[in-house]
Amino acid sequence: MNIYDQLQPVEDRYEELGELLSDPYVVSDTKRFMELSREEANTRETVTAYREYKQVIQNISDAEEMIKDASGDAELEEMAKEELKESKAAKEEYEERLKILLLPKDPNDDKNIILEIRGAAGGDEAALFAGDLLTMYQKYAETQGWRFEVMESSVNGVGGIKEVVAMVSGQSVYSKLKYESGAHRVQRVPVTESQGRVHTSTATVLVMPEVEEVEYEIDQKDLRADIYHASGAGGQNVNKVATAVRMVHIPTGIKVEMQEERTQQKNRDKAMKIIRARVADHFAQIAQDEQDAERKSTVGTGDRSERIRTYNFPQNRVTDHRIGLTLQKLDTILSGKMDEVIDALVMYDQTQKLEALNK
């Protein structure tokens, strides 16, 4: 099947979507309208590139025709040959780009995310490193123009992060941060270490796509919500009115506690966002486990306990174990300049998928 055979139906469907999205019946159906809007957004880049590619093909044809008709006009012939050379080079570039755009798209790529970071093995040092990761993702979000909102956090006595839950909103957030789930290992000399020995600690990161209510509806009878007084440092109650919310999804036992906001309703809304994402993620993981061959990500094993990256402070080195990438830029990466790592992961993923399709 040539590239036209693959891409023309995509363009035809894109034009059909444009008509459907202006249909009053579709507009009045929120769920259907969102599904079609998302489908249109997911194909827009491919269709735009395909239309540009067709123009390049036309340019090649025009240049070849001009060379034939030059009739001894050396200047015109030279100009046409230059145009032909540039257009053929552009054709190759577009074909490579279109092959990647035709790869099966992760339906979650354009979604916002719920980001969870926890200090794991290593006590206080693990919690401090979890705080470093939080700062890294916050700064990276700034460079991307994303909104980063801490929804719930728990700190320890030395200022480290026991657990933090954040919402990251913006363009294509999940597509870039989905590779961050897993165990992140740090090797450094803790501030409390008097002998100068390097210690190894771990923090875990979980990235889940935000799930809208129209996409995944939780039966209210499966939820239990308890209201209690928010507590501050030392455990003292800080609100005279009970505003904190503890929400439990009874079938799975998944629990969320929220007390960051000053009103019960805002805490309930945030808790609902998190529990919806966690429950949807829980069942998605079960479905993937049942289809093990499809479950394993091309970047790593897909196992969330997998050690994905090591941050070695003495050597200013970051190593991503899934793709064998080592960079002597730890300070740069932790300051939020993550593009080199993320771009390498995306490229590796795309290359593996292309190879799989060509087998």
Curated annotation (Swiss-Prot):
GO CC annotation terms, alphabetical? cytoplasm
Example GO molecular function term? translation release factor activity, codon specific
Q: How is it modified after translation?
A: Methylated by PrmC. Methylation increases the termination efficiency of RF1.
- Which of UniProt's keywords are assigned here? Cytoplasm, Methylation, Protein biosynthesis
Q: What is its main location?
A: cytoplasm
Q: Which SMART domains match?
A: PCRF
Disulfide bonds, which pairs? none
Q: Does the keyword Protein biosynthesis apply?
A: yes
Q: Which Pfam families match?
A: PCRF (PF03462), RF-1 (PF00472)
InterPro entries reported in the protein's UniProt record: PCRF (IPR005139), Pep_chain_release_fac_I (IPR000352), Pep_chain_release_fac_I_sf (IPR045853), Prokaryotic/Mito_RF (IPR050057), RF-1 (IPR004373)
Residue(s) carrying N5-methylglutamine: 236
Q: Which Gene3D superfamilies does the UniProt record give?
A: 3.30.160.20, 3.30.70.1660, 6.10.140.1950
Subcellular locations according to the entry: Cytoplasm
Q: Which superkingdom?
A: Bacteria
The entry sums up its family as follows: Belongs to the prokaryotic/mitochondrial release factor family.
Please explain the role this protein plays, according to its UniProt record: Peptide chain release factor 1 directs the termination of translation in response to the peptide chain termination codons UAG and UAA.
PANTHER family, alphabetically? LD18447P
Designated name of the protein: Peptide chain release factor 1
